[in-house]
Regions:
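Positively charged n-region of N-terminal signal peptides that target proteins for export
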Residues: 1-5
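Bacterial N-terminal signal peptides
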Residues: 7-16
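A conserved helix-loop-strand patch within extracytoplasmic ligand-binding domains
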Residues: 21, 97-147
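Short, well-ordered beta-strand elements
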Residues: 21-32, 52-56, 123-124
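Ligand-binding cleft/hinge of the Venus flytrap
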Residues: 39-50, 135-156
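Short helix-initiation/N-cap motifs at beta->coil->alpha
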Residues: 54-65, 152-156
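Alpha-to-beta junction loops
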Residues: 68-78, 122, 145
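Ligand-binding "clamshell"
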Residues: 85-97, 111-112
Length: 156
């Protein structure tokens, strides 16, 4: 995780912080792993005389609207297709600065311990936004759980 934090520090936080007269920057994050990574970055920046303010959000819409409205200097929670989709839907003009890491996608169950135990007709919850929904469907297809017709998944 320290390598991810260092990459983020070098590519996102320091350039923005250098332009801040008060040497502080406010970054919007979602809980895990983004907040945990920013806590490490905060300690690294403090050594160089910068203050990192971490604002935690529990949804994936507000960090972009807060950034567009100016209450954040940056945010750290999304992949590029999600950002591009949000820009189109909300008519925003946000740009990405750095690609940092790939989010894991997991299947969780209280009853099923192995993927092979998943029965035909089982229900699986997936994300409800276009880019992450498409990604989830692709991963389910890649693992042989569903079949998707060619050309149906074009958003991610």
């Amino acid at each position: 995780m320290k390598k991810i934090a260092l990459a983020l520090l070098l590519t996102l936080i320091i350039p923005a912080a250098l332009f801040a007269a008060d040497r502080s920057i406010t970054v919007g994050v979602t809980p895990f792993p983004h907040k945990d990574i920013m806590v490490i970055v905060k300690d690294l920046l403090k050594k160089d005389g910068y203050e990192l303010k971490i604002k935690e959000f529990t949804d994936y819409v507000t960090p972009n609207t807060a950034l567009a409205e100016g209450s954040l200097d940056a945010n750290f929670f999304q992949h590029v297709p999600y950002l591009e989709n949000t820009n189109r839907e909300k008519k925003l003009d946000l740009v990405w600065v750095a690609k940092v890491h790939i989010e894991p996608l997991g299947l969780y169950s209280n009853k099923i311990k192995k993927l092979s135990e998943l029965k035909n007709g089982a229900q699986i919850a997936i994300p409800n936004d276009a880019t992450n929904c498409s990604r989830a469907l692709r991963l389910l297809e890649k693992n042989g759980l569903i079949k998707v017709r060619a050309g149906e998944l074009v958003t991610a």
